């Protein structure tokens, strides 16, 4: 299949344009609905079915009193036994592989540097698109950490030719703007903090307001342009109507294209982007998919840029993927030992998802030096899960009050009043926080204990509030529920504690933009809670947890049905996503994108797990496949 040529094929708007969609279809795509339809391009396996009803069991009071009736949810057990994890090994940690990777890195840098130096191959008609293609490919392959300087130089060059009302052409001397180049530039420049307006997309509409391309373009070139238009539309800011129109139109167009074109690297890219978009996309999963899609299509058909060595990029990407895989196994073995030796494995009433949490962490950050971030993320998520199950089901009201008070006193002597199962959890939490504080002092240069303690106390207060609601069968208003639920989701603590261990300076003015009570934190927490509720409210209700965004909305709106509540909440999530884009990428921010990106990516990881169902509670087929493809299975070199 012919892909986009590096030679500019633009024509004026007044000459030879063909609409990309019929007039009737435009009305359907742009006017009837303002929400992108659910996109499920791949056939998935039958989901793992779990009975989520409560079981009531009898426990003897630790103090020698009567028998306590406890509620236990029927969570499935850990799927990844410690013996299995400890048996895993990888040859890719050897020096020979890292040395090969270092050699290829230098060769790819030479490719980058050849773009401005080789005027014969990369002339004034293709130099902008070539740079954008190179940056985009390197980032999607997960190897961009080696080329930060080259990426910045390339994007500075592209931005110098950006026109606010027209965008760019394929090259600096192109006569007319090009949709493919402009859409790719809009997305890439925006994600790197450049101030670019989506208004440029208005240029690529015909007289009727429909998106259009020059009639001279091939179907493959048009499809590539629409694909990059769709990708650009996903980084929309609030109020950008043209981006909403672009998203609806391009999603519809690409779905129809998939029904016609043969299997190829282009069809594979389209399937992946429609499946995961931007806000449920995980960098490591994308890297593996991008590698496999391009290899399966054959090297002879994969190269949009015939003068760039895609084979060399894939060679480096595969080496990097497998070298990190070796580190992943070592870190995962350490986490599994921690889970077993801490006694967590003996807590039969709770969910055990430490392997899944590690998968999320390593899909967020693939930098070898961020080991502390990954380990901290897993431990925090595991502990929040255990505590959530204690407060929602297993613990009695008296025990929960004792535990909450003990946390606020932050004194090990208070554990003597706790039941045995709570003592171990308290000690694990105490140790986890102190280890993080010690690590954070190295990276942040100050004592963060009080800051972290306050965050945990706020979490426990909301846990306690929800326990009271369950105990009294109280159903709050939607506003009352969401105010509490944004904190009880655990999003703040699951983000704050890991990012403080990064080698990214987070002075107070940056934390004020990321952490509570910032708008960034509120949006991230809302997305997690609302998306989670849409996926697990029925299972929660079966466990006796009546309060959810769905049930509270229906209480506030008598006569409404679940579908009404879900539509309202999904609209809230869509709005929050665009606003979170703004908080991450806003050009007027005092905080660099790099200081906010890990917090943003944690939100993406949780959103990914909740994409189709509650993969956080139930390790369904999508979750298990994610573990296999991004952690356990290396690529064939």
Curated annotation (Swiss-Prot):
Molecular function GO terms recorded: (4S)-limonene synthase activity; magnesium ion binding
Pfam families assigned: Terpene_synth, Terpene_synth_C
Short motif (DDXXD motif): ranges: 388-392
Subcellular location: Plastid, Chloroplast
Domain of life: Eukaryota
Annotated transit peptide: 1-56
Chain sites annotated for binding Mg(2+) 3: 540
Entry domain remark: The Asp-Asp-Xaa-Xaa-Asp/Glu (DDXXD/E) motif is important for the catalytic activity, presumably through binding to Mg(2+).
Protein family (similarity comment): Belongs to the terpene synthase family. Tpsd subfamily.
Name of protein: Limonene synthase, chloroplastic
Higher taxonomy: Eukaryota, Viridiplantae, Streptophyta, Embryophyta, Tracheophyta
Gene symbol of the encoding locus: ag10
């Amino acid at each position: 299949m012919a892909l986009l040529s590096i030679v500019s094929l633009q024509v004026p708007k007044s000459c030879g344009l063909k609409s990309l969609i019929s007039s009737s279809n435009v009305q359907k795509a742009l006017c009837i609905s303002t929400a992108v339809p659910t996109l499920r391009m791949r056939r998935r396996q039958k989901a793992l079915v779990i009975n989520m009803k409560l079981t009531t069991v009898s426990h003897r009071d630790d103090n020698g009193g009567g028998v306590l009736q406890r509620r236990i949810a029927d969570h499935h057990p850990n799927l990844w036994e410690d013996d299995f994890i400890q048996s895993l090994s990888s040859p890719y940690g050897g020096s020979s592989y890292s040395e090969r990777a270092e050699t290829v890195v230098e060769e790819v840098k030479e490719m980058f540097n050849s773009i401005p130096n080789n005027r014969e191959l990369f002339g004034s008609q293709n130099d902008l698109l070539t740079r954008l293609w190179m940056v985009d490919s390197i980032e999607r392959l997960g190897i961009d950490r080696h080329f930060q300087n080259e990426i910045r130089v390339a994007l500075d060059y592209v931005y110098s030719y950006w026109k606010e009302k027209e965008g760019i052409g394929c090259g600096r001397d192109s006569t007319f703007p090009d949709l493919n180049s402009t859409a790719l530039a809009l997305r890439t420049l925006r994600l790197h903090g450049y101030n670019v307006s989506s208004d440029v997309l208005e240029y690529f509409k015909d007289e009727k307001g429909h998106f259009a391309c020059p009639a001279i373009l091939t179907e493959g070139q048009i499809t590539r342009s629409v694909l990059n238009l769709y990708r650009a539309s996903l980084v929309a800011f609030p109020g950008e109507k043209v981006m909403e129109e672009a998203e609806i139109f391009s999603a519809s167009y690409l779905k129809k294209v998939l029904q016609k074109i043969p299997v190829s690297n282009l069809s594979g890219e389209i399937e992946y982007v429609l499946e995961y978009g931007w806000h449920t996309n995980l960098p490591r999963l994308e890297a593996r998919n991008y590698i496999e899609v391009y290899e399966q299509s054959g090297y002879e058909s994969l190269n949009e840029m015939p003068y760039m060595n895609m084979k060399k990029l894939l060679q480096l990407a595969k080496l990097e993927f497998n070298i990190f895989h070796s580190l992943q196994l070592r870190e995962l073995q350490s986490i599994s030992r921690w889970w077993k030796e801490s006694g967590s494995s003996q807590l039969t009433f709770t969910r055990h998802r430490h392997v899944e949490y590690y998968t999320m962490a390593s899909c967020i950050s693939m930098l070898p030096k961020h080991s502390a971030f990954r380990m901290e993320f897993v431990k925090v998520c595991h502990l929040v899960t255990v505590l959530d199950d204690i407060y929602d089901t297993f613990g009695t009201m008296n025990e929960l009050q004792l535990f909450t008070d003990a946390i606020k006193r932050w004194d090990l002597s208070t554990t003597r009043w706790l039941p045995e199962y709570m003592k171990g959890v308290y000690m694990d939490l105490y140790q986890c926080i102190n280890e993080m504080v010690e690590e954070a002092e190295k990276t942040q240069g100050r004592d963060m204990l009080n800051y972290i303690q306050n965050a945990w106390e706020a979490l426990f207060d909301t846990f306690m509030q929800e326990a009271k609601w369950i105990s009294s069968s109280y159903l709050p208003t939607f506003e009352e529920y969401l105010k509490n639920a944004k904190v009880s989701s655990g999003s703040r603590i699951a983000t704050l504690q890991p990012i403080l261990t990064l080698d990214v300076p987070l002075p107070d003015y940056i934390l004020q933009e990321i952490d509570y009570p910032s708008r960034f934190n509120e949006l991230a927490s809302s997305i997690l809670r609302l998306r989670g509720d849409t996926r697990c409210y029925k299972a929660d209700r079966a466990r006796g947890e009546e309060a959810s965004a769905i049930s509270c909305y229906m209480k506030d709106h008598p006569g409404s049905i679940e579908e009404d509540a879900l539509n309202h909440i999904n609209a809230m999530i869509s709005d929050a996503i665009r606003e979170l884009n703004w908080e991450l990428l806003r050009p007027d921010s005092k905080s660099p994108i790099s200081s906010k990106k890990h917090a943003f990516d944690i939100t993406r990881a949780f959103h990914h797990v909740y994409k189709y169902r509650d993969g956080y509670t139930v390790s369904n087929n999508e979750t298990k496949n994610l573990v296999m493809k991004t952690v356990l299975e290396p690529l064939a070199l």
